[in-house]
Structures are given as C-alpha cells and as structure tokens.
C-alpha cells in the first residue's frame, strides 16, 4: 500500500479507499504529535474521516458521564475508536463496552502501534527481522520496552535490554517471557547489549506523567546513553531507532540521532502506513 502511494500527494486518498464512508473517534487523554497526526492522515488516506476528542471537551473527561455510557454512544456514532491513555485500565474498560474495534494508541502498559511502525522500518532498511538482534537501552520497564518484548515473540527476533536493575522488566512480563520462551537477555552493561546488534533503540528517560524524581532517574540512566562510541560496537549496517519525542543529549546524542545510521524520521512516517494496516485489519 505504501509503494502504491509513491506518485500521490501526501493528502491524496489511496485509490481503493477501503475506509470510505467510515469514521474513527480518537480520544487523547495524553498530549500527542505523531499519534494524532499519523492516525488522522491514515484515516484520510484510506478514504475515511476522523473525529478528535479531548477529555476536557467531552462529558467523560469532565467526570459527569461514565466511561460505559460514553463507549455505548461511540458505538452508535463511529466504526473504530483509538484511545491514547495514561491508564491501560481505561482501554480495557472501553473495550468491554464498545461493540466496535478499539486501538491502543498508547497506554502506560504498551505502545503496540509504534512497535509495528518500528518493525516495518527495520524490514524496509535491513530485510526480515526474524533472527536479528535488537538492543534496547534505558528504562526496561516502560510501555515501549513491554511492547518490544511482546514483538520479540511474535516476530522471532533476539532482544537484549540494557538497563539498571531498578528499571528491569517487571515480574509479570518476565513470567510471560519464560512461558513463551522469548529470546530475551537483560544486562546492566550497555556494551553487552549493543555488541554485534542489528538495531539499537532507546526512548525518552522520563515519560509523560511519570510520577518520579526526574533528575534522579536521569542520573541513574546516564550511563545508558546511546552515543557514537556505543553505536560503533553494533554491526556496521545497524540502524538507530527512537519513537520520539527525544531528549537530545540525554538518552541519545545529536551525533547519533542525526547521523547516517538513524532512521527515526522514516520511522515517524511509517506510523501512518503501519496504522493504515491496523485500521484495515480491524475492519476485515
């Protein structure tokens, strides 16, 4: 589908318009740049329309309507709901009462749409991801690392996580890893994770709404910064990925994110194409 768009303008719809006559409601409980724009563009390219709902502008967000009642109304109005939320429980509750598909646009537990874009970006750059080695540096217990661990099982790649013990994946995740025989290595040494890897990934050290001492967390994670010296330990054709927004000079240096191995801008673009596939899959 992406290849078929090569000669089309950015705002032009796909020729087959599979989402024509349909609409998506997007609820943003957290600020967003890429998720908001990419889903909006994705629905339009598929021939449909989107409605953006901010909590401070709807009854559910104001607390004078239950989530259940809001979900039932949305079922009557639209074909799909996308929710970006601080609480995964909200996502599960909406799913319980909706009679239409709901997409996780980000929660405190996972960020699956971003990971699908990352897989697409890797395979465009370096071929099949199966059997390859990805290194994750920084917080090993956030929504991105959780979804990456799940993806390692689905797409059969090797995953190495370098993180302080304090920020290791939680016990529930590790139990799932053991049960599903995921090829996961956890280390406190960044060099060990990155050595001979095919892709190096990281994320902002302090996420939105993190109830932590920001400066203390940054200090703990300082030695897990992705820099040129660390990237040199990866394979020569290894790529660097980051979901954005980025803390330049913190989790990654300018030299790396703006360097030849960085694919972060294509990664951001691929949010549109990955999410188009997700929307279409929901309707098929």
Kindly label every feature range from the protein language model:
Residues 23-77:
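Active-site cofactor/substrate anionic-group-binding motifs, chiefly glycine-
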Residues 178-255:
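Rossmann-like adenosine-cofactor binding region
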Residues 237-238, 243-284:
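Adenosine-phosphate binding glycine-rich loop
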Residues 1-37, 41, 110:
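Positively charged, low-complexity intrinsically disordered leader regions
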